[in-house]
């Protein structure tokens, strides 16, 4: 090679190296970074640990389908009212029509609304289970959520079964106005009928549980259980501080703070939740 061609060859070699580097790609979703401690881990490692960080025990949000897989005996799940869908009684529109938002969210999540309900077994013990899903419009409680949970509790009362509801919600769904707010009383009324039959209701609060859900069925459990460091509140922290003109503690509205002040009965890590629920169910069954 002549000396005059050497710079050209060098540039071609550099371009080849750059091209080769660009071809190295990492598949989307392969890695997950913990929001709390910053640990970088394989997604499958996180999933295997029930979406709990193996280093700091931070609890990632879990979908309703993941919750069913985590809690219910394999092959025993019988879903209820899967075809119930919300209408748009107010013709509500913000950035888009509410009716279109429902369709878009249903397509994205493969859910019809923000709760799944059904009957299954936990180590052979039959239970009625409702699982709210924060992915569907922030787990907001509209007429379908209220109707599905009410039907679930009525079935539990009729068949004399314990009921468990896993809460994950931003509160009442503003797009349905008063129809959303009335679900608080509707579900609470069904719970009262369940209670009069001396049947067990367990409320499990996950992050976040706020607004009208907190103000109704989330806090009506015979035992109220929460995941660690869950955000549990009615109004937002900033709203309260501006109203009372005082600074709030750093851990205010956390499950640990509420436990210390007597609002919760148990704080149970997700990895132990199934075994703890089974233990409570068996204690209740053996004493009745």
From Swiss-Prot:
Residues 30-288 form the CoA carboxyltransferase N-terminal domain. Its EC number is 2.1.3.15. GO terms for biological process: fatty acid biosynthetic process; malonyl-CoA biosynthetic process. It comes from the Eukaryota. It is found in: Plastid, Chloroplast stroma. SUPFAM superfamilies: ClpP/crotonase. A zinc finger (C4-type) spans 34-56. GO terms for cellular component: acetyl-CoA carboxylase complex; chloroplast stroma. The keyword Zinc-finger applies. It catalyses: N(6)-carboxybiotinyl-L-lysyl-[protein] + acetyl-CoA = N(6)-biotinyl-L-lysyl-[protein] + malonyl-CoA. One of its GO terms (molecular function) is acetyl-CoA carboxylase activity. It holds the Pfam family Carboxyl_trans. Binds 1 zinc ion per subunit. InterPro entries: AcCoA_carboxyl_beta (IPR034733), Acetyl_CoA_COase_Trfase_b_su (IPR000438), ClpP/crotonase-like_dom_sf (IPR029045), COA_CT_N (IPR011762), Znf-ACC (IPR041010). Keywords: ATP-binding, Chloroplast, Fatty acid biosynthesis, Fatty acid metabolism, Lipid biosynthesis, Lipid metabolism, Metal-binding, Nucleotide-binding, Plastid, Transferase, Zinc, Zinc-finger. Belongs to the AccD/PCCB family. Acetyl-CoA carboxylase is a heterohexamer composed of biotin carboxyl carrier protein, biotin carboxylase and 2 subunits each of ACCase subunit alpha and ACCase plastid-coded subunit beta (accD). Component of the acetyl coenzyme A carboxylase (ACC) complex. Biotin carboxylase (BC) catalyzes the carboxylation of biotin on its carrier protein (BCCP) and then the CO(2) group is transferred by the transcarboxylase to acetyl-CoA to form malonyl-CoA. PANTHER family: ACETYL-COENZYME A CARBOXYLASE CARBOXYL TRANSFERASE SUBUNIT BETA, CHLOROPLASTIC. This is Acetyl-coenzyme A carboxylase carboxyl transferase subunit beta, chloroplastic. The gene is accD.
